[in-house]
Amino acid sequence: MKQFIEFIPLIVFFAVYKFYDIYTATGALVVVTGLQLIYSWVRYRKVEKMQLFTFLLVGFFGGLTVFFHDDAFIKWKVTVINILFALGLLISRYGFGKNLIKQMLAKELQAPDAIWDRVNLAWVGFFTVCGLLNLYVAFNLPQEMWVNFKVFGLLGMTLVFTLLSGVYLYRHLPAEQKGELKK
């Protein structure tokens, strides 16, 4: 259920865009992302840092989009978030010695540090490519294609990359842990 709730702002953005326009959809995105934050606080008594970070960026770029009536701001948000994710993974690993991907998954999966570092760098590359690809689509193709890319393209790419990361990690798990996962 919690994972579904994460997609609600994206679904609302897409639906409102199809019936109205980018500015109404952006306003709806800001409101629903804020409501999502409130729901998390009421339901779970905590707000994830990533949720708060996303809300702040959505609020900032969405607010600028609506205020200036310029869709360039909301288009840039996708790239900024992806580049910040990539930088966050890089800086946490090589600046502070913490591999965030490993921290998120190490409770369930044990793999050598070198493997975690490769997965971390792969995600850095993935987020960077997504950010750059978004720039290309946002500013070289029609707005409707960008909305479809943002909603379906990036989501699909992320799901595929997550699966590929899982397959890569699975190949490097100790034999006894592979047996546990098959049960």
Swiss-Prot record:
The answer to whether UniProt assigns keyword Transmembrane helix to this entry is yes
A Pfam match is IspA
Q: Which GO terms describe its cellular component?
A: plasma membrane
**Where is this gene product found?**
Cell inner membrane
InterPro entries assigned to the protein according to its UniProt record, in alphabetical order = YciB
Membrane topology of the entry: Multi-pass membrane protein
Q: Where are the transmembrane segments?
A: 22-44, 54-74, 76-96, 119-139, 149-169
Q: Does the keyword RNA-binding apply?
A: no
Keywords carried by this UniProt record = Cell inner membrane, Cell membrane, Membrane, Transmembrane, Transmembrane helix
Q: Using the UniProt record, give the first listed, main subcellular location.
A: membrane
Family affiliation: Belongs to the YciB family.
Q: Which PANTHER family match?
A: INNER MEMBRANE-SPANNING PROTEIN YCIB, INTRACELLULAR SEPTATION PROTEIN A-RELATED
Record function comment: Plays a role in cell envelope biogenesis, maintenance of cell envelope integrity and membrane homeostasis.
Name recorded for this polypeptide: Inner membrane-spanning protein YciB
- Tell me the organism: Aeromonas salmonicida (strain A449)
In the UniProt record, the gene name given for this protein reads: yciB
